[in-house]
Design a protein with these regions (language model features):
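Structural/interface elements that position substrates and couple domains in central-metabolism enzymes
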Residues: 1-172
Length: 172
């Protein structure tokens, strides 16, 4: 039985199957080779939620003094039923988040469809291609009492798992 991820608008996306991973890594290697030939640094943003999607767009929009792009960004999201849908949306040039700042959606569209400096993926093998890794995963702070930020705890499971994935996929 196949698993699906549903966007907030109800669009249905089939989760990747085992043979999709090698195809996806080949797609990324081709993109990265072209971007390196243009002299661009490869940046991987791990997590493309509210913070990560904006970070990926801002970095992908970076340019030198002559207006030339300097970075190629791979936004990486785990392929879960809860969040996989963000990947195909970004790859269409659509923002996976709602924000009051209209520039975010414009920047994502520009970087994906015009500048070609942003893509999204589900494969952790993408880490092997990165020059720089930015980790933007959810770390909730659970307050025990209002007005006292010193009493509470941070839920760091996603961050710890991210570090394990990074360690398994990059060389020192």
């Amino acid at each position: 039985m196949s698993d699906y991820s549903f966007s907030p608008t109800g669009e249905k996306f089939l989760l990747p199957e085992q043979d999709d991973y090698s195809k996806e890594f080949e797609r990324l290697k081709e993109l990265v080779n072209r971007q390196r030939a243009l002299g661009r640094e490869i940046v991987l943003v791990m997590g493309i939620g509210f913070v990560g999607a904006v970070m990926a767009a801002v970095v992908a929009d970076a340019q030198d003094g002559k207006g030339n792009p300097t970075k190629f960004v791979i936004g990486m999201q785990r392929p879960s039923t809860r969040s996989f849908w963000k990947i195909p949306l970004i790859n269409r040039g659509l923002s996976p988040i709602s924000t009051e700042d209209p520039e975010v959606a414009l920047m994502i569209e520009r970087c994906v469809n015009k500048k070609k400096t942003l893509t999204a993926t589900f494969t952790y093998d993408a880490l092997k291609l990165a020059d720089v890794v930015i980790v933007d995963v959810q770390c909730d702070y659970l307050k025990e009492s209002l007005g006292n930020v010193r009493s509470g705890q941070t839920e760091m499971k996603a961050l710890e798992e991210s570090f394990e994935i990074i360690a398994q996929n990059i060389s020192p």
